[in-house]
Amino acid sequence: MYKRQAYELIESGKVSYVVYTGALRDDTMLEYIALHRRALAKSIACLTSLDTANALADILKSRYNERNTELVDLCHMREARSELHFAKMQCAGTDYIVIDNRNGQVSCAESLCVGACDRHFGVGGDGIALIEQSDIADAKMRMFNRDGSPGGMAGGCLLLVAKYLHDRALAAGGEVTIEAGGDVKRVKLFLTDGKVTSARVDMGEVVYEPARVPVALPGSEVVDRLIEIGRRDFRVTCLSMGNPHCVTFVERVDALDLQVIGPLFENAGIFPERVNAGFARVVNERMIKLRVYERGNGETLACGTGACAAAAAAVKLGKCPEGEDITVKLPGGDLIVRIERDRAYLTGETAQAFEGVLAY
């Protein structure tokens, strides 16, 4: 009976790991081999050591998971930690740890990100940005969310990386090009006493095609569509700014319990890659109030792509004008967005909080 139940659980898709604790006898090993083969066919990890299983349980209980845990070669471990120089930077309160990784020193950004972004035991931040070599731009940016997952695109982070490059003479002129998300972004710099104090980036095309957002809903686009999330009805507009966004216009932004509603949106089944959920109110035709619950981060003080998404949705629905600056007010400050022919332009102030060295 127990053998049948084990196979039924494996077939149900509810099992992520199999831990074998049976005796090493011929009859039990044959049963394990058969179970092991079936589990592997369903892409289920099989563990044969209680120590390994306990270590995995500790990992799953912590903020680490199978996507951001570093595999270490025990035969070739480093004898000492190396030093990573970083800059802690912010744009309207969304803060990133910016690291020059042109030498390829960071081997597992996902694991580094989880520890470094912890606001109690690390530097603290909404994510990390690695600056790397590029053949097609001044530099390449790879951004990771606080949980170690790849961020894809981040508008505020682009502005901060541009400031980092200019202020350290890693790029010259009044414009910086950054390779990010498979595209090259152009960032115009505004200087005070030779340092970048604000910047403007062409965020590129606003994408509404569901397959490219992605969102698993029918139709050529999802605009002002009524859907059910957490047993409540919401009118949503889904789009991509290089990462997936879902925008909902509400009467009272401050009244929302984002710690409850946010995860329901982020992990809804219609979003195969999760989603950044924006909750907006149009104050007037040139001002939007916005809160964003980011995938992998939770609610943040600001979100550049989220501001672009909210402005684009407002223009799409005729709530705000095209080709005009729209002030997007977020908990951490203001961002300026302009939508022109389904392209988004983001402007924001940039600042460095401090520099330091991480033991890595």
Task: Give the ranges of each region predicted by the language model.
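Conserved small/polar residues in nucleotide/adenosyl-binding loops
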Residues: 1-5
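Peripheral docking tails and interdomain loops at the edges
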Residues: 7-81
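Short glycine-rich anion-binding loops that position phosphate/pyrophosphate groups of nucleotides
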Residues: 21-26, 92, 146, 206, ...
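Short acidic, glycine/serine/threonine-rich loops at helix termini
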Residues: 30-31, 57-61, 190, 212-214, ...
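A glycine-rich beta-to-alpha transition motif near the start of alpha/beta enzyme domains, typified by
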Residues: 81-195, 246-360
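N-terminal, positively charged, Ser/Thr/Ala/Gly-biased leader segments
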Residues: 81-105, 201, 213, 218-239
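Membrane helix-loop-helix hairpins that form the core translocation module of multi-pass transporters
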Residues: 194, 198-206
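Selected transmembrane alpha-helices and immediately adjacent juxtamembrane segments
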Residues: 236, 244-247
